[in-house]
């Protein structure tokens, strides 16, 4: 089953039972994730495979998708700096190691998009699911946040991009985050990405 078929299958259900105990919507979403993931696994007949660095209730439909239970017009924290770096074929788990990897990969012409990031959005109002990769999202559904790297919101449509356009999108998000968050305290990036 491809993601479109999975989305259609899941949208036959509307009893997603989203918690609304807290005044904080993020808390309610997190409290609901376990139930929603278990229900998705049950509907799709998935025996969840827990890989390293996965939370108990993380989705694993095909490759570790990210479940977001959100209001239709709200941005939600989605992709960390290290995950964004990994998408671009970079190694490392902190600013310095990712900087070294970027420098090496850039000098060797090895910067490329090696994986996409799939998000399963559950709309709190309509109880409908939208499955989209980062590179399918329209630009107005993606924001760079200096504190949390990449935020996304539920798209009303998807964008088809070439492989080069997908790389440019992710690479530009990476650079935008560095310029907003890292560049001020770490000037060593400036010449490498902007010079």
Residue ranges and their predicted role:
Residues 1-55, 69-195:
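Nucleic-acid endonuclease domains
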